[in-house]
Structures are given as structure tokens and as C-alpha cells.
């Protein structure tokens, strides 16, 4: 698993000596929010209004963080409103690839070969790991978020007026308990 350094792909791997061989997940690099009216969310900038068909989700079926966004997409009836591309589950030297076979859909938006190219499209000088899930804004051609816990919170209520689905998986009275299961 490589990374982007100043917008250039590098095949450098995790330095596991610094972490005693443990995987340490980096903080997400894109933390904007989709809101019902397009106002800024808890982090990031404004301009991401909930609109049917405007957003795209990049996932891997091999990633549990991406998997939970797919579960929420289905539970909140967003399948017809947020399109999806599935990367190949095997991550090699170029990171997540957009192979097209029984395990992956390919990049249905831009026909990219690798997910890092989506990060470069969003931020040409990006530095950091290229991770899934990625919530993409097709209108502004940029990453809204790559933080799964925030993506599922957006999916929980932001599109309710569009879908009519008012199921609430993040009720105010239970949020502290929910954090035990949704925090990374």
C-alpha cells in the first residue's frame, strides 16, 4: 500500500517499526459534510448540498470501514441517489485498483486505473494514504469525505427529505452508546 507525496504516487509502505508492527490508521484527510441545505457541517467547508445523483461512493468489499457505508446506503434507501464504484479487493503496489472483474466494478465515473488518481483529481498536491471509503462530489469533482464514521452520519439524516426514509440510526439519546461502536 503506497501513498501520495505532494501529488505523486510512491510505493512506500507503512513503517511498522515505529508502531511495533501494528497497523495505525491515519486521520482522514477530507472532512467536509453534505448537509440538507449545503451549509458547512461540523468540519470542513460549505457547499455540499444533499441532491439526488450528485454524489458517488468509492468502496472496497475488503474494507470494514467502507462496508459500513454500503450498509447505511442501503438501509437509508440511498441506492438510487448515490452511485458506487467498487475497487478490486487486492491492494498491490499501486494501491486500490479499478480492475473490472467479478470482484470490482471499475471506476464508473472517470475510468481511472487506480484510486489514487481520484485523490489527485480532487487535490493535485495531496499527501497521505489513499483509503476507502471515498465520498465524491460529481458536481465540484472533489472528495467530500474519506472518514467512514462521518459518512454514515451524513447518510443517516441528510437525505431524509429526498428519500422519505426517516429511520434514525444516530438518535440523540443513544449517541454516547453509539460512539462505542462507530468510532474508529
What are these regions (language model features)?
Residues 142-143, 161-169:
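Short, polar/flexible loop-turn hinges at active-site or ligand-entry regions and domain interfaces
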Residues 1-49, 53:
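N-terminal regions that are enriched for targeting/export leaders
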Residues 181-184:
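Conserved small/polar residues in nucleotide/adenosyl-binding loops
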Residues 90-108:
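Charged, often glycine-rich, active-site loop that binds/positions anionic groups
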Residues 70, 76-78, 122-123, 139, ...:
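A generic secondary-structure signal for well-formed alpha-helical elements
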Residues 47-90:
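Local sequence-structure signature of Cys/Sec-based thiol-disulfide redox active-site neighborhoods
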Residues 141-154:
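Non-catalytic, surface beta->alpha helical segment in thiol-disulfide oxidoreductase systems
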Residues 112-134:
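Structural micro-motif
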Amino acid at each position: 500500500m503506497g501513498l501520495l507525496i505532494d501529488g505523486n504516487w510512491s510505493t512506500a509502505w507503512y513503517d511498522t517499526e515505529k508502531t511495533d508492527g501494528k497497523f495505525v490508521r491515519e486521520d482522514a484527510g477530507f472532512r467536509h459534510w453534505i448537509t440538507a441545505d449545503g451549509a458547512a457541517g461540523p468540519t470542513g467547508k460549505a457547499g455540499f448540498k444533499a441532491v439526488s445523483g450528485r454524489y458517488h461512493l468509492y468502496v472496497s468489499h475488503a474494507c470494514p470501514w467502507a462496508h459500513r457505508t454500503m450498509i447505511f446506503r442501503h438501509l437509508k434507501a440511498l441506492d438510487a441517489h448515490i452511485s458506487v464504484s467498487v475497487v478490486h479487493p487486492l491492494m498491490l503496489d499501486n494501491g486500490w485498483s479499478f480492475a473490472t472483474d467479478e470482484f470490482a466494478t471499475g471506476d464508473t465515473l472517470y475510468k481511472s486505473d487506480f484510486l489514487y488518481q481520484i485523490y489527485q483529481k480532487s487535490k493535485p498536491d495531496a499527501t497521505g494514504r489513499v483509503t476507502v471509503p471515498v465520498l465524491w462530489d460529481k458536481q465540484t469533482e472533489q472528495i467530500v469525505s474519506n472518514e467512514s464514521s462521518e459518512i454514515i452520519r451524513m447518510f443517516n439524516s441528510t437525505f431524509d427529505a429526498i428519500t422519505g426514509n426517516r429511520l434514525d440510526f444516530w438518535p440523540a439519546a443513544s449517541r454516547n452508546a453509539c460512539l462505542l461502536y462507530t468510532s474508529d
